[in-house]
From Swiss-Prot:
The keyword Magnesium applies. InterPro entries: BRCT_dom (IPR001357), BRCT_dom_sf (IPR036420), DisA/LigA_HHH (IPR041663), DNA_ligase (IPR001679), DNA_ligase_AS (IPR018239), DNA_ligase_CS (IPR033136), DNAligase_adenylation (IPR013839), DNAligase_N (IPR013840). Residues 591-669 form the BRCT domain. The keyword Zinc applies. GO terms for molecular function: DNA binding; DNA ligase (NAD+) activity; metal ion binding. It comes from Bacillus cytotoxicus (strain DSM 22905 / CIP 110041 / 391-98 / NVH 391-98). This is DNA ligase. Zn(2+) binds at C405, C408, C423, C428. Its EC number is 6.5.1.2. It is an enzyme of class 6 (ligase). The gene is ligA. The active site is at K116. CDD domains: BRCT_DNA_ligase_like, LIGANc. GO terms for biological process: DNA repair; DNA replication. The lineage of its organism: Bacteria, Bacillati, Bacillota, Bacilli, Bacillales.
Length: 669
């Protein structure tokens, strides 16, 4: 592959993985299997490793999770809620053990093993023993404030046995018996049932009415101590024992293992015992027990090096494939999906499974009428593993992908170096609808309340056909749609109006220009500052910008060399949509009259004059970056009253420390 082709593929993989992360971690509505996600991630990691010049800070390969919903207030975690690396077999566990021992130079190590609860990760904050705030994991950096819903969980103490200030992490879950009862009630009421206990727990905690969560009989296991003031903890097992003494519910099935053989035995034991539990688990978490060794091993941007999650193999069942359905995405990619005779897999009824592309169908020789093996990778997303050839009768029908789009009947093409078939008709209704869904999404124009269901209704009612049509919607039109009342219609009109003020990069990303992801959109917006400047740019000018390759430059020029696009931009202007970049330019950071420009800052302790969130906003507005933990890259620690371990770490590493008074003096310069 040429460098341009490599860069193009990397951008496509990043966009794809960001979408998958958003669907899985934020919407609780995954669209692909773990296996497909892992294949794409491994391809991205391989390409980035071989082409380090294309590695970016916001690549899914170094980032945790995806974006946060706007239903609840946003909460920035004091320290990131990192995800864990995965192990799928004994060899992966032994590799983990080898890496750990190499990282600590042969020092004796012991592990602590815990059941991996399949629920919703949450963070709980206590001040002087009182529960003051609880939040979801979100994207690992920012979560949602769900304090009132968490207070309904009886396993969460509202007051601890000691007046300590701390932050703990845990997993909120729904017991199996509660899940069965809830779905029976929903079926009786004619309501849609939850797919699994994890979705039920997540859905319950995202209800705006705490009374609903209170009826759901949720529970929670605390699995870690993120921060504590005035106490030194030397091991993870000590932390769990201490948390149990404070009144938290910790899982009793944890075990200290002196060797990796003992770890493997523990994994095998609980793989057998798993069905006997009254809650879902999807694996085993293995951690280095000693905190000092954890610190020596450190973390990557995505996960700690001292812990790993062993994922149980997925349950496999056999069912009949009755048909293949096609869907068209916003870029014209046509994706086949298997239609199955309903079968129960990992606790839920499965009727459909992704087949990904024509090559996979051909490689696995999948035919209509075949009996196929189906599993839920990660116990979540259905996929066809293989065909049961012994069950073939000769009546099965070979499947051939169509030559024309199933939506608009235009001819399909396979572009060079792609496995997917594409519809290249820009007027294809399916592409327009999917493009509209992308335009309003979180990383684009971020219009709250305008999701896939509403877009589909608006599209089918012929109220919208272009992005600009959204800004001409009226409350009266919305009131004609299903499930819209006066308040919801007014709220959506206000949300659409508010999106006009977005910075240029969101609009550029929302337009869906081929090869232009969220990062490239920001780079373009920052460089050109206005839409008009970008529209006038030539290919050579674009290629001169760092991170903009030849393929992307060609795509941008081609996109804006279209009368329909220019008309769309004029419509945006007529509706008052912002066309300028509102962020701080990197080139201007050095001119900001502030110490903070380009610096990494950590806030700790209580600030009297302003809260930490306000201080964070001020620092970031002045070009600084605020993180939740002290590291070698930290330039400054601002310490308020009752500053804890972060202050001690700063002193240990000779990092500059300010009190609040010094901080305020700098702000007032």
């Amino acid at each position: 592959m040429s460098k341009e082709a490599v860069q193009q593929r990397i951008e496509e993989l990043r966009d794809l993985l960001n979408t998958f992360n958003y669907q899985y971690h934020v919407l609780d509505n995954p669209s692909v299997s773990d296996a497909e996600y892992d294949r794409n991630m491994q391809e991205l990691i391989k390409l980035e490793t071989e082409n380090p010049e294309f590695i970016t800070e916001d690549s899914p390969s170094v980032r945790v999770g995806g974006a946060v919903l706007d239903i609840f207030e946003k909460v920035t975690h004091k320290s990131p809620m990192l995800s864990l690396g995965n192990a799928f077999n004994e060899g992966d566990l032994r590799d983990f053990d080898r890496r750990v021992r190499q990282g600590i130079d042969g020092v004796n190590v012991r592990y602590i093993c815990e059941l991996k609860i399949d629920g919703l990760a949450v963070s709980l904050h206590y001040e002087k023993g009182r529960f003051i705030q609880g939040s979801t994991r979100g994207d690992g950096i920012t979560g949602e404030d769900i304090t009132q819903n968490l207070k309904t969980i009886k396993a969460i103490p509202l007051r601890l046995q000691e007046e300590v200030t701390l932050e703990v992490r845990g997993e909120a879950y729904m017991p199996k018996r509660s899940f069965v009862k809830l779905n029976e009630e929903k079926e009786q009421n004619g309501e849609a049932v939850f797919a699994n206990p994890r979705n039920a727990a997540a859905g319950s905690l995202r209800q705006l009415d705490p009374k609903i969560a209170a009826k759901r009989n949720l529970s929670m296991f605390v699995y870690g101590l993120a921060d504590i003031e005035g106490k030194t903890i030397t091991s993870h097992s000590e932390a769990l024992d201490f948390l149990g003494e404070l009144g938290f519910k910790t899982n009793p099935n944890r075990r200290i293992c002196e060797t990796i053989e003992e770890v493997i035995a523990y994994v095998e034991e609980w793989q057998e015992k798993r069905p006997n539990l009254d809650y879902e688990i999807d694996g085993i978490v293995i951690k280095v027990d000693d905190v000092t060794l954890q610190e020596r091993l450190g973390t990557t941007a995505k996960s700690p090096r001292w812990a790993i999650a062993y994922k149980f193999p997925a349950e496999e069942v056999v069912t009949r494939l009755t048909g293949i359905e096609l869907s068209v995405g916003r870029t014209g990619v046509v994706t086949p999906t298997a239609e199955l005779e309903p079968v129960r897999v990992a606790g839920t009824i499965v009727r459909r499974a992704s087949l990904h592309n024509e090559d996979l169908i051909r490689e696995k020789d999948i035919r209509i009428g075949d009996y196929v093996v189906v599993k839920k990778a990660g116990d979540i997303i259905p996929e066809v593993v293989n065909v049961v050839f012994d069950k073939r009768t000769g009546k099965e029908e070979a499947y051939h992908m169509p030559t024309h789009c199933p939506t608009c009947d235009s001819g399909l093409v396979r572009l060079e170096e792609e496995v997917a078939l594409r519809c290249i008709n820009p007027a294809c209704p399916a592409q327009i609808r999917e493009g509209l869904i992308h335009f309003v999404s979180r990383n684009a124009m971020n219009i709250d309340g305008l999701g896939e269901r509403v877009i589909t209704q608006l599209f089918e009612a012929n109220y919208i056909r272009t992005f600009a049509d959204l800004y001409g919607l009226t409350k009266d039109q919305l009131l004609q749609l299903d499930r819209f009342g006066e308040k919801s219609a007014s709220n959506l009109v206000q949300a659409i109006e508010a999106s006009k003020e977005n910075s240029l990069e969101r609009l550029l990303f929302g337009l869906g220009i081929r090869h232009v992801g969220a990062k490239a959109a920001r780079t373009l917006a920052e460089h050109f500052e206005t839409m008009d400047n970008l529209v006038k740019a030539g290919e050579e000018e674009l290629k001169a910008i760092n991170e903009i390759g030849e393929k992307m430059a060609q795509s941008i020029v081609t996109y804006f060399d279209n009368e329909d696009v220019l008309h769309l931009i004029q419509q945006f202007k007529d509706y008052g949509v912002n066309m300028t970049y509102k962020g701080i330019k990197r080139a201007d950071l050095q001119n900001i009259a502030s110490y903070f420009a380009g610096k990494t800052v950590v806030l700790t302790g209580k600030l009297e004059v302003m809260g930490r969130s306000e201080a964070k906003k001020k620092i970031e507005a002045l070009g600084g970056k605020v993180t939740g933990s002290v590291s070698k890259s930290t330039d400054l620690v601002i310490a308020g009253e009752a500053a804890g371990s972060k202050l001690a770490q700063a002193e240990k590493h000779n990092i500059e420390i300010w009190n609040e008074e010094r901080f305020l003096q700098e702000l007032n310069k």
